[in-house]
Amino acid sequence: MKVYLHDVNRGLGVFLLAVSFLLPGCSSSGGRRASVPVTVDATAQVVEQARQTWLQEHPNWSFYGRAAIRQGSDGGSVRVEWEQHGRGYRIVLSAPMSRQSWVLSGSSSGPARLEGVGGWVRVGEVAEQVLFEATGWQVPMGLLPDWVRGRNSDSGGGDVQLDAEGRPHRVYQGGWQLRFLDWFPSSVGRPMLPRQIEASRGSARIRLIVDQWDELIP
């Protein structure tokens, strides 16, 4: 995964913030807007249920994308690459202009490892805590793999508003609000997947554009 940040001195912190917003994550920006009820017909409900089933049955995937990030008056852009193998993940970040790079890897059921330029390593049992100690950011790593694919979270507790196709349109969970702005159409052997996602929480804003989705071989 490659990351390009205008402010490289804060690259890791901004990137990790970006990742937390990227994934079908929720974001909350000071309150929910009143929503207009959407009618989802029976056919769309069946298609969406089939999509959710497919996502559950295909836990190995990766995506490449771009994100615009803003935290208060600070902003930048990033390249993102994420690989997920079931419960395990590996995220590689690099800022070519500053020659900085980071690798975050681990599992939702095991320890997380964060490696940075110069060989420093931080390891912990909980990914959220590892990232917080390194950056000061709270990143809901346990929810991101579901959010980024528009999958109903196994952890529950969220509020999901659907579009006319029966897909997630807005998601509110864990203090985050997420909006799905565009989707890749379904193709042979693969259902619709998010193409453009916008997330916000307080003064933080992220817009993710996914360039490519891939299914990984176990």
Swiss-Prot record:
GO cellular component: cell outer membrane
Lipid attachment points (N-palmitoyl cysteine): 26
Membrane topology note: Lipid-anchor
Keyword Signal in record: yes
Presence of the UniProt keyword Magnesium in the record: no
Localization in the cell: Cell outer membrane
Coiled coil: none
Lipid attachment locations (S-diacylglycerol cysteine): 26
GO biological process, one term: protein transport
Role, per record: Plays a critical role in the incorporation of lipoproteins in the outer membrane after they are released by the LolA protein.
Family: Belongs to the LolB family.
Subunit (UniProt): Monomer.
Protein's recorded name: Outer-membrane lipoprotein LolB
Taxonomic placement: Bacteria, Pseudomonadati, Pseudomonadota, Gammaproteobacteria, Lysobacterales
Gene that this polypeptide is encoded by: lolB
